[in-house]
């Protein structure tokens, strides 16, 4: 019998009560649910590529890609498909099972849709799951991407409805919810989460997760981002969030959305190994892999695999993309895990069974 129920009617008071639990109680509850649903030692790996960088007309205060802020970012045109495919091949060789493509747009133009759908088809033909984040989508655009075979669409809610206006004024909260509805209606999977550490209050972190958990269907993937402060953006000097509050956010997300993948997303470059380990225990089971997330730093692949080996974690090897035996970094980590398990006479670390 399951120790949890999948709900869509969480009150703010209930969510805030979870945040207020003693840390040990919160982690125990979150990890128990996580272990019941997922392999607790398996982490899904995604690679994120910026296919069009900078010059975004929006005013999101956290974003270095906004044309409104002087961050020194050089804008780039939409990448050629062959360049995207080269990056996708490298991602697959490094162990990624999902390839995410992001463009700094308010919304895609109709003239770009044939190009984008061709891009999806080509990447998907490699055996990778595909994801895009292109801004707001109309119902028609969502259907076009779905027909091309796009698996996931990312569109974050960013924060609570109450704090949202302090961060963004060029797009409403309802605009974001409408895009998520269009994505779901088209038959694609939803990737939606938010950013913490933007100067919000604890009740705003609760409000963000409440909104996500009370969607008609929970997001399939929930990225939790720690703000990466970029010089030139309005949030470049905001106070740092207590790392333990970040862990609490991961844990509450796992409790509220037990069947979703919770992604430890932006900000990992500045997180200690110990903090990341706590997040994995709290229920995070997905990461972005590679040295860059759109325009901000991310841990090197070798660093991630070293951490995986030390924690006894293994990359997910799902139906979409099986890591080839000669994929250097992941294969080496898997062999080391397996060797350590054999040395202890018990299969403590590596188990390739799905």
UniProtKB/Swiss-Prot annotation:
Cofactor note (record): Binds 1 [4Fe-4S] cluster. The cluster is coordinated with 3 cysteines and an exchangeable S-adenosyl-L-methionine. Binds 1 [2Fe-2S] cluster. The cluster is coordinated with 3 cysteines and 1 arginine.
Cofactors: [4Fe-4S] cluster; [2Fe-2S] cluster
UniProt-annotated binding residues for [4Fe-4S] cluster: 56, 60, 63
Annotated SMART domains: BATS (SM00876), Elp3 (SM00729)
A Gene Ontology biological process term: biotin biosynthetic process
Broad enzyme group: transferase
Positions of [2Fe-2S] cluster binding: 100, 131, 191, 263
Protein family: Belongs to the radical SAM superfamily. Biotin synthase family.
Assembly with partners or alone: Homodimer.
Functional description taken from the UniProt entry: Catalyzes the conversion of dethiobiotin (DTB) to biotin by the insertion of a sulfur atom into dethiobiotin via a radical-based mechanism.
Protein name per UniProt: Biotin synthase
């Amino acid at each position: 019998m399951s120790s949890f129920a999948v709900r869509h009617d969480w009150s703010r008071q209930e969510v805030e009560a979870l945040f207020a639990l003693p840390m040990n109680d919160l982690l125990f509850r979150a990890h128990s649910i996580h272990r019941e649903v997922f392999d607790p030692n398996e982490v899904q790996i995604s690679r994120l590529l910026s296919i069009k960088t900078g010059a975004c007309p929006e005013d999101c205060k956290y974003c270095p890609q906004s044309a409104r802020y002087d961050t020194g970012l050089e804008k780039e045109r939409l990448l050629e498909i062959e360049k995207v495919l080269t990056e996708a091949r490298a991602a697959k060789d490094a162990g990624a099972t999902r390839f995410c493509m992001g463009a700094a747009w308010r919304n895609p133009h109709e003239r770009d849709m044939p190009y984008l759908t061709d891009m999806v088809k080509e990447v998907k033909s490699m055996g990778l799951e595909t994801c895009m984040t292109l801004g707001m989508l109309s119902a028609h655009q969502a259907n076009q991407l779905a027909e091309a075979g796009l698996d996931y669409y990312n569109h974050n809610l960013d924060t609570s409805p109450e704090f949202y206006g302090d961060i963004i004024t060029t797009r409403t909260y309802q605009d974001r919810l409408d895009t998520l509805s269009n994505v779901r209606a088209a038959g694609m999977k939803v990737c939606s989460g938010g950013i913490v550490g933007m100067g919000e209050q604890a009740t705003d972190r609760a409000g963000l997760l409440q909104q996500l958990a009370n969607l008609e269907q929970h997001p399939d993937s929930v990225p939790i981002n720690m703000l990466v402060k970029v010089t030139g953006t309005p949030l470049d000097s905001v106070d740092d969030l207590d790392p333990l509050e970040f862990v609490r956010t991961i844990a509450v997300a796992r409790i509220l959305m037990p069947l979703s993948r919770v992604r430890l997303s932006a900000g990992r470059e500045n997180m200690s190994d110990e903090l990341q380990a706590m997040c994995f225990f709290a229920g995070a089971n997905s990461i972005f892999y590679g040295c860059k997330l759109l325009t901000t730093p991310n841990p090197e692949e070798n660093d991630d695999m070293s951490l995986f080996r030390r924690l006894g974690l293994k990359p997910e090897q799902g139906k979409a993309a099986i890591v080839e035996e000669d994929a250097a970094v992941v294969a080496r980590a898997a062999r080391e895990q397996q060797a350590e398990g054999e040395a202890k006479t018990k299969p403590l670390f590596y188990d390739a069974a799905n």
